[in-house]
Amino acid sequence: KNDQLADFVDQFVDYCTENIYMIFPKEKDARIADSILELFRRRDILEIFNKKALYFNIREMVDAKTPKITSIATRLARIFQEKYLIYQEHGYFEH
């Protein structure tokens, strides 16, 4: 089960990275999204698990206010949930 989730997360990150300007047409939004995705890319070596520290980490990568980061994170979470439902139901990542 953990391997499946790790596989899904890798595919999710790849999908969002490849389509970042389609999902987030504004340059600043795309940069914020990429910094969030970077945390997913580094998840195996990250030692930060609380929300406050994650937000701080993102703000260090991109100069953005918390509400803007939350807005981008919410959009990514929505995509994650939609794609994960399909992945669980059909066993593959739908692009």
Residue ranges of model-derived segments:
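Transcription-machinery-associated regions
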Residues: K1-H95
